[in-house]
Amino acid sequence: MSQNSVTELTTTVLRKSKGRKLQDGDRLLVHYQGELLNGEQFDASFDFSSFEPEEGRTPFDFVLGAGQVIQGWDQGLNGQKLGEVVELKIPSELAYGEQAIGDTIPSNSPLIFTVEVLAVLPGGEAVPIYLDFKDIGIKTKKLGLTDELLATVQFTQTGLDLNDELNGRDQADLLIGLKGKDTLHGGLGADVLIGGKGKDRFLYTALEDSLVNEEGRDHILDFGKKDKINLQALADELQFIKKGKFSGTAGEVRFAKETLSLDIDGDQSAEFVVALPGVEKLKGSHLLL
């Protein structure tokens, strides 16, 4: 893509939302990532590949339409919605024009920004509006995402409407995949996992990723017919015994009463447990062993 190939401002929605529509005079709180057309990053508060904040960076706030940011932002974000993630392709005349910005942005450079709208303070109001789960299609009551579960969450990571890879921290995470073929790996801690629409994969790489006690186990809240749970890293040989009792053979995996359990050493007791609320039946095809 040549330096001058962006001739007009274009906006692509990477994550849809039904949140409040943005308008001039709103104070916005956003995360962003900026790149040149060659893919070279020149500034960012957030990495939209790892879905992690950049070290030492915090969200950025500004008043929409007040000239506090480049014209491409003021024009491209007007009419978008709270909770959306949008990609702005901005021609140079709506960016910095002939002005070079340090050693990072040459003169006459079109720019690409990915922007997530985290919150909005409407003009003249005193209380900001934050994203609601329902705005991005998460029906908390239907899924069983209770206040009690949310109270355990220490970190939330929400993907795009693409094929995302979400990796939790070593704590209790809430990972939300939304649309696309997503891979969710909560890691250590009692994680809450929501794949969303699409053929999702729930990855486990250590027994400690989901513990036996109720307070330490993961919850997969929306496991669907096309989803799979990957346990291949836990042992060389695993066998699914449906709802049968553990027989004393190492590597048996069973599912009963909305609970997936693994007896890794053949002692007829589980060393790994995942809760699947609302799932009445699990097939062998749902497991990667």
What do these predicted regions represent?
Residues 163-167, 172-241:
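Acidic, glycine-rich calcium-binding repeat modules characteristic of RTX/beta-roll
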Residues 136, 146-151, 155, 244-289:
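Low-complexity acidic/polar repeat-biased segments
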Residues 13, 64-65, 90, 117, ...:
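Hydrophobic residues in beta-strands and at strand termini
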Residues 35-37, 205, 232, 261-265:
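Predominantly extracellular/luminal cell-surface or secreted proteins
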